[in-house]
Structure formats: structure tokens, C-alpha cells
């Protein structure tokens, strides 16, 4: 069975047992009345069952309802169909004041019907020939308004300075000021020029997201013809069907696939309604993607440490034990489904590098947009500063130093022999984003 953990807030006067019992049939075989066609099938075989209800500690009138769904309810290899059933009509149910899907347990019998990520972590490292450290990226800014040639110039400067990747912002598709084909051409030129000068394999996340699946695949085909290593998709706004189609194309044609989660906070930010990001992360691992944005813990975007690391490990690891302290409601066995690299992006700069290296480890992408392009000396020096800071943190960690305790000292030591890093340290020494996370247990 697929197991689901729902946070249920019943309407006043509705017992939690009744609310939990209402969720199970509405998201499986039930309707509001008995119908004569019920007798033409075996409802006991197909109906969802609420098998346990427990109160949420510290919250009034909130309960976790556990529901089991038989696998025969779901089409194989379709995240779209799975979500249509589990989170379809039930969220509008009048007996419920609010409902949130906290977690899913996907059994191997179902997860094995999915291709999953086009390539996975190990294959990506082999393609890039980069090991033993996090990968470095940068989102090109301003996100909208640049011409294709100036955009390509910024890509080249960042890659030449030492970054592994640059990125289209999620908003960048094919607008009047920069059509997609022009952007792809200038970015490919920037990649090849930077590779020739540095001797390293480089990439730019070319956003293939489009208004139709046919147009999306056309853009991915052109990227493949240019010989670039990676494309990008906005998987929530683009949709799971489109994402799975693109993931299949990417595996068949040797392209890595970077996933942006634009629109996720509409779904996952409210504590008692919607769907937790760990569910969206599991769905993405099945639908397919080699990278996905996962918050930073220390930057400008939402993310509490233990909860963030809970779904980061769900993306990377083959097997994860139930751990309620990290928000993981079920033991999850991914069997041989490839892993996904978490991307830390949003309001981060060189002073965050020790914490990011310590929190996310080697199998991650650390992405500095303003933290690269905002360098007072320009884009390439901004990239140099980030690469020097990363190499210093990795070396210090490998020598046994404590990044959490000695991080600032490690950055100061490195800045003594890197003027680019010293300038970055001076610019961003006072920048902090200290707001309380909404996503707490």
C-alpha cells in the first residue's frame, strides 16, 4: 500500500475519527452516498483505509490521520494520477477546516514503475569529472531584461571565474527581450569558451519550460544539438506530466535535468494546509530530475535545519528510517532509484560557505546569484571568491577542522591570499536574514 500522513483540522463539532474516516474514501473509492454500482465491484479491495489517528502535540484540534491506499488505485509510473487521487477533491471537504499532506510512503512495488532521475548523482559526477566537493552555481541576474548577448557574457564571466554551473532564472522562458533560441546559442558559446580557458567541464541550466509539452521538447532537442550538458524545468508550474516526459527525453539523450520548484510555497508553506515539500520532493524523485532546489537553512528563503535535511536525505539516500524529529513519518526504501542533488540557493554569500558545506555535504549544489554577481569587482571576481571560499572550506573539513565553530576564521585565512574573496567578505559582512522559519514540527 501507499501510506499517507494527513494533518487534519476538523470543523467544530466533528470528531477526529469522523474526519479521518472521511478523508480515506473521498481520496479513493467513495462518494457522498451509496450508489447501486458499488455492488459491481469489491470495494473492500480498493478503498482507502484510515488506520490510525493521533493528536498533534502543542496544537489544538489538529490530528495526524494515517491512510493506506491499495496500489491498484494508481496508474503505474504516473505522479499525476497518484496526486489526483490522494490530494484531489478531498481538500475541499466541508467537514474539514484544513488539511495538509505531511508525508507519503511509496512502496518499492510502485516506485519501481518510475524511471526516476535521468542520471543521478554518481553519473553526473562522472560526466563532469568533479569529485569530493559540492558543485558551485550562480543564477544570472537581473533575472529579466538582459539581451541574449549580454546574458551570455555574464554566463562566460561566471564560468571562467571558477563556477561549475550558471542558471536561467525560473522566469526566463522566451520573452520579447530575449528569445529562447538566441539565449541558448550565446550560452553555448559561453560554455565552450570557458571550458577551453579553464580545462573544466562547465554547464548552464537552459530553461526548457514552455507553454506546451511539444515546445518544451523542441527546446530540449536544440540544447542537445548544441552539445550542452544540462537543461532545466519548472516542475510545478510546468506540471508533472511534462516533467516526466522531459526526464525520459533527458535520459535517452544524455542531458542532465535541473529542476526549479517555483510555486512550491503556495502549496507547502502553511503549516496546517496544503502539502509538505518532502512530499513534492519524493514526487520529483519519481517523476525525474537530477537537481532540485531545497532551501538553504541560512539564506533568505524558508527552511528549518532538521526538516530541510530530512527531505534532502530523502532526495539523496537509498534508504531512510522513520524519524519524526526531522518530519519523516515513514521509513522509505528507494531500492535502486537514482538520487537527486539538492540545490541550496537564495540569499547566500561567502560568509555562509562554511555552514553550507557542513550542512549539505559534498553531494549538493551551492548556488550564489547575488552572492556572485554582486561582487564589487564584477562577475568573474565574484565567481573566484566563491570558488576560493569553497576550496578553503573543503580543505579545512578534510583536515578535521570544525566548520561550524571555525568557519569565519577559515574564510578570513583564505581571504589573506585571495583579494577577490577579501573584497567579497567586506561587502557582505553585515548581510543576514534572521527570520523565524514557518516550517517547524
UniProtKB/Swiss-Prot annotation:
<comment type="similarity">
    <text>Belongs to the RuBisCO large chain family. Type I subfamily.</text>
</comment>
<dbReference type="GO" id="GO:0019253">
    <property type="term" value="P:reductive pentose-phosphate cycle"/>
</dbReference>
<comment type="subunit">
    <text>Heterohexadecamer of 8 large chains and 8 small chains; disulfide-linked. The disulfide link is formed within the large subunit homodimers.</text>
</comment>
<dbReference type="Pfam" id="PF00016">
    <property type="entry name" value="RuBisCO_large"/>
</dbReference>
<keyword id="KW-0560">Oxidoreductase</keyword>
<dbReference type="GO" id="GO:0004497">
    <property type="term" value="F:monooxygenase activity"/>
</dbReference>
<feature type="binding site">
    <location>
        <position position="170"/>
    </location>
    <ligand>
        <name>Mg(2+)</name>
    </ligand>
</feature>
<feature type="binding site">
    <location>
        <position position="293"/>
    </location>
    <ligand>
        <name>substrate</name>
    </ligand>
</feature>
<feature type="active site" description="Proton acceptor">
    <location>
        <position position="260"/>
    </location>
</feature>
<keyword id="KW-0460">Magnesium</keyword>
<keyword id="KW-0934">Plastid</keyword>
<dbReference type="InterPro" id="IPR017443">
    <property type="entry name" value="RuBisCO_lsu_fd_N"/>
</dbReference>
<feature type="active site" description="Proton acceptor">
    <location>
        <position position="141"/>
    </location>
</feature>
<keyword id="KW-0602">Photosynthesis</keyword>
<comment type="function">
    <text>RuBisCO catalyzes two reactions: the carboxylation of D-ribulose 1,5-bisphosphate, the primary event in carbon dioxide fixation, as well as the oxidative fragmentation of the pentose substrate in the photorespiration process. Both reactions occur simultaneously and in competition at the same active site.</text>
</comment>
<feature type="site" description="Transition state stabilizer">
    <location>
        <position position="300"/>
    </location>
</feature>
<feature type="binding site" description="via carbamate group">
    <location>
        <position position="167"/>
    </location>
    <ligand>
        <name>Mg(2+)</name>
    </ligand>
</feature>
<keyword id="KW-0479">Metal-binding</keyword>
<keyword id="KW-0456">Lyase</keyword>
<feature type="binding site">
    <location>
        <position position="345"/>
    </location>
    <ligand>
        <name>substrate</name>
    </ligand>
</feature>
<dbReference type="GO" id="GO:0009853">
    <property type="term" value="P:photorespiration"/>
</dbReference>
<dbReference type="GO" id="GO:0016984">
    <property type="term" value="F:ribulose-bisphosphate carboxylase activity"/>
</dbReference>
<feature type="binding site">
    <location>
        <position position="143"/>
    </location>
    <ligand>
        <name>substrate</name>
    </ligand>
</feature>
<keyword id="KW-0503">Monooxygenase</keyword>
<keyword id="KW-0601">Photorespiration</keyword>
<feature type="modified residue" description="N6-carboxylysine">
    <location>
        <position position="167"/>
    </location>
</feature>
<keyword id="KW-0120">Carbon dioxide fixation</keyword>
<dbReference type="InterPro" id="IPR020888">
    <property type="entry name" value="RuBisCO_lsuI"/>
</dbReference>
<dbReference type="InterPro" id="IPR033966">
    <property type="entry name" value="RuBisCO"/>
</dbReference>
<dbReference type="InterPro" id="IPR036376">
    <property type="entry name" value="RuBisCO_lsu_C_sf"/>
</dbReference>
<protein>
    <recommendedName>
        <fullName>Ribulose bisphosphate carboxylase large chain</fullName>
        <ecNumber>4.1.1.39</ecNumber>
    </recommendedName>
</protein>
<keyword id="KW-0150">Chloroplast</keyword>
<dbReference type="GO" id="GO:0009507">
    <property type="term" value="C:chloroplast"/>
</dbReference>
<feature type="binding site">
    <location>
        <position position="261"/>
    </location>
    <ligand>
        <name>substrate</name>
    </ligand>
</feature>
<dbReference type="InterPro" id="IPR036422">
    <property type="entry name" value="RuBisCO_lsu_N_sf"/>
</dbReference>
<dbReference type="InterPro" id="IPR000685">
    <property type="entry name" value="RuBisCO_lsu_C"/>
</dbReference>
<keyword id="KW-1015">Disulfide bond</keyword>
<dbReference type="Pfam" id="PF02788">
    <property type="entry name" value="RuBisCO_large_N"/>
</dbReference>
<feature type="binding site">
    <location>
        <position position="169"/>
    </location>
    <ligand>
        <name>Mg(2+)</name>
    </ligand>
</feature>
<feature type="binding site" description="in homodimeric partner">
    <location>
        <position position="89"/>
    </location>
    <ligand>
        <name>substrate</name>
    </ligand>
</feature>
<dbReference type="InterPro" id="IPR020878">
    <property type="entry name" value="RuBisCo_large_chain_AS"/>
</dbReference>
<dbReference type="GO" id="GO:0000287">
    <property type="term" value="F:magnesium ion binding"/>
</dbReference>
Amino acid at each position: 500500500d501507499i501510506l499517507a500522513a494527513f494533518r487534519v483540522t476538523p470543523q467544530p463539532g466533528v470528531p477526529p475519527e469522523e474526519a479521518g474516516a472521511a478523508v480515506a474514501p473521498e481520496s479513493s473509492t467513495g462518494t457522498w452516498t451509496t450508489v447501486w454500482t458499488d455492488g459491481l465491484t469489491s470495494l473492500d479491495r480498493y478503498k482507502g483505509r484510515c488506520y490510525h489517528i493521533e493528536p498533534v502535540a502543542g496544537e489544538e484540534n489538529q490530528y495526524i490521520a494515517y491512510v493506506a491506499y491499495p496500489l491498484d488505485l494508481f496508474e503505474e509510473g504516473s505522479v499525476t494520477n497518484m496526486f489526483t487521487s490522494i490530494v484531489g477533491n478531498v481538500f475541499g471537504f466541508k467537514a474539514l477546516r484544513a488539511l495538509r499532506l505531511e508525508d507519503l510512503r511509496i512502496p518499492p512495488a510502485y516506485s519501481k514503475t518510475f524511471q526516476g532521475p535521468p542520471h543521478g548523482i554518481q553519473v553526473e559526477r562522472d560526466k563532469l569529472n568533479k569529485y569530493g566537493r559540492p558543485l558551485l552555481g550562480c543564477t544570472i541576474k537581473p533575472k529579466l531584461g538582459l539581451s541574449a548577448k549580454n546574458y551570455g557574457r555574464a554566463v562566460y564571466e561566471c564560468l571562467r571565474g571558477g563556477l561549475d554551473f550558471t542558471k536561467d532564472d525560473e522566469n526566463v522562458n522566451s520573452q520579447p527581450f530575449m528569445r529562447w533560441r538566441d539565449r541558448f546559442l550565446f550560452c553555448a558559446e559561453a560554455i565552450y569558451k570557458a571550458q577551453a580557458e579553464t580545462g573544466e567541464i562547465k554547464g548552464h541550466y537552459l530553461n526548457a519550460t514552455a507553454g506546451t509539452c511539444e515546445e518544451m521538447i523542441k527546446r530540449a532537442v536544440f540544447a542537445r544539438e548544441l552539445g550542452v550538458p544540462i537543461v532545466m524545468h519548472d516542475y510545478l508550474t510546468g506540471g508533472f506530466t511534462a516533467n516526466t516526459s522531459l526526464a525520459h527525453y533527458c535520459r535517452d539523450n544524455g542531458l542532465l535535468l535541473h529542476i526549479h520548484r517555483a510555486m512550491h510555497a503556495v502549496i507547502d508553506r502553511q503549516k496546517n494546509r496544503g502539502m509538505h515539500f518532502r512530499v513534492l520532493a519524493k514526487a520529483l524523485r519519481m517523476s525525474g530530475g537530477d537537481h532540485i532546489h531545497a532551501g538553504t537553512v541560512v539564506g533568505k528563503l524558508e527552511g528549518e535545519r532538521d526538516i530541510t535535511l530530512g527531505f534532502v536525505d530523502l532526495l539523496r539516500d537509498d534508504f531512510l528510517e522513520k524519524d519524526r524529529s526531522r518530519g519523516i513519518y515513514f521509513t522509505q526504501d528507494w531500492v535502486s532509484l537514482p538520487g537527486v542533488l539538492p540545490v541550496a540557493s537564495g540569499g547566500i554569500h561567502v560568509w555562509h560557505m562554511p555552514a553550507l558545506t557542513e550542512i549539505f555535504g559534498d553531494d549538493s549544489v551551492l548556488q550564489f546569484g547575488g552572492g556572485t554577481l554582486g561582487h564589487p569587482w564584477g562577475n568573474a571576481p565574484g565567481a573566484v571568491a566563491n570558488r576560493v571560499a569553497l576550496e578553503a572550506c573543503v580543505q579545512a573539513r578534510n583536515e578535521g577542522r570544525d566548520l561550524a565553530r571555525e568557519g569565519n576564521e577559515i574564510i578570513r585565512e583564505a581571504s589573506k591570499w585571495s583579494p577577490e574573496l577579501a573584497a567579497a567578505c567586506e561587502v557582505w559582512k553585515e548581510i543576514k536574514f534572521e527570520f523565524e522559519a514557518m516550517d517547524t514540527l
